[in-house]
């Protein structure tokens, strides 16, 4: 019966444990507390990658000192994407490796594909994480949230990827409801009227639509007659020439979009460059390239035409000192 009550990772992991860990770095015991200089460096790095995140991420990174005001999506973003980059070389090796145990485990449990293949492995990572957490931060911090981490893989085994059973959809829809209310009087009636006027089923947001025409190129010689656009919405996904929304996985290769073209036939193509060299981002606790997390260097000089239908996965790309690190985008908000 107890196992039938699922754990919500939004509250357990994001608003619970990750928030707790950051608080220990800032004002915890001396053995795990970071210096003010290190916190400032991490915070500045976080703010510097704001423009590199996809626009459908509703919140951009803020200073680590503002963690008490972060929303659940910000803690999730830190755990899965920005944290592994900005913490590298700033935490001790033991603390960073322990953070990566949690980050990699959650990446697996939040991906529908990886969850099916590596659910058992993610459970082992979480048990290892909790054991090492006690050694690094002290057993006095092994609270209920920390203990429950070891049971997340059991829920994923039963119900699939953890986003299937999280509170995030309800939290996101709450914002939609709030936008339907214009004044404090009779809020329920206002919501009912707005819903009756225009059913918010999301069809409009998923319609394919080319936006922001231009004529600046680059183009390809085998596309003689065409229109050029800076942005295209395809089945709810924003495809753009701008940093943050211009990197996609194409048959295992990372494509950087330079232009969007509509042929006379109506077919939509992107003009892309591909990264030519890639390596894994980290080797602990697993070769990260197995999860699609890679470092990329050296863009090709050649341009290629790629149909928008071939852009299978949107990527989160963050700058490194030499090159970029690529993460599969697991969420659209």
Predicted regions located by residue number:
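Terminal interaction-prone segments of large eukaryotic proteins
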Residues: 1-4, 8-15, 19, 23-333
């Amino acid at each position: 019966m107890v196992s039938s009550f699922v754990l919500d990772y939004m509250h357990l992991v994001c608003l619970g444990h990750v928030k707790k860990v950051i608080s220990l770095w800032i004002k915890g015991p001396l053995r795990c507390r970071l210096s003010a200089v290190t916190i400032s460096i991490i915070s500045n790095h976080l703010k510097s990658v704001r423009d590199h995140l996809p626009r459908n991420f509703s919140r951009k990174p803020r200073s680590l000192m503002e963690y008490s005001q972060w929303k659940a999506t910000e803690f999730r973003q830190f755990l899965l994407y920005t944290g592994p980059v900005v913490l590298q070389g700033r935490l001790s090796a033991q603390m960073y490796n322990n953070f990566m145990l949690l980050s990699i485990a959650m990446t697996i449990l939040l991906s529908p594909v990886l969850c099916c293949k590596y659910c058992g492995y993610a459970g082992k990572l979480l048990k290892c994480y909790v054991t090492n957490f006690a050694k690094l931060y002290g057993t006095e911090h092994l609270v209920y949230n920390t203990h429950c981490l070891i049971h997340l893989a059991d829920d994923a085994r039963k119900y699939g990827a953890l986003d299937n059973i999280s509170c995030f959809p309800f939290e996101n829809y709450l914002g939609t409801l709030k936008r339907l209310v214009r004044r404090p009087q009779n809020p329920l009636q206002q919501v009912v009227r707005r819903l009756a006027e225009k059913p918010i089923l999301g069809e409009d947001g998923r319609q394919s639509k080319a936006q922001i025409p231009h004529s600046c190129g680059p183009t390809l010689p085998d596309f003689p007659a065409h229109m050029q656009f800076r942005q295209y919405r395809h089945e709810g996904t924003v495809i753009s020439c701008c940093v943050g929304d211009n990197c996609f996985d194409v048959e295992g290769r990372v494509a950087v979009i330079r232009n969007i073209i509509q042929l006379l036939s109506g077919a939509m193509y992107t003009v892309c460059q591909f990264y030519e060299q890639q390596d894994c981002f980290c080797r602990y606790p697993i070769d990260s390239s197995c999860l699609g997390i890679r470092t990329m260097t050296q863009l090709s000089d050649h341009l290629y035409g790629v149909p928008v239908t071939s852009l299978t996965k949107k990527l989160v790309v963050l700058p490194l000192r030499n090159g970029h690190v690529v993460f599969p985008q697991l969420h659209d908000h």
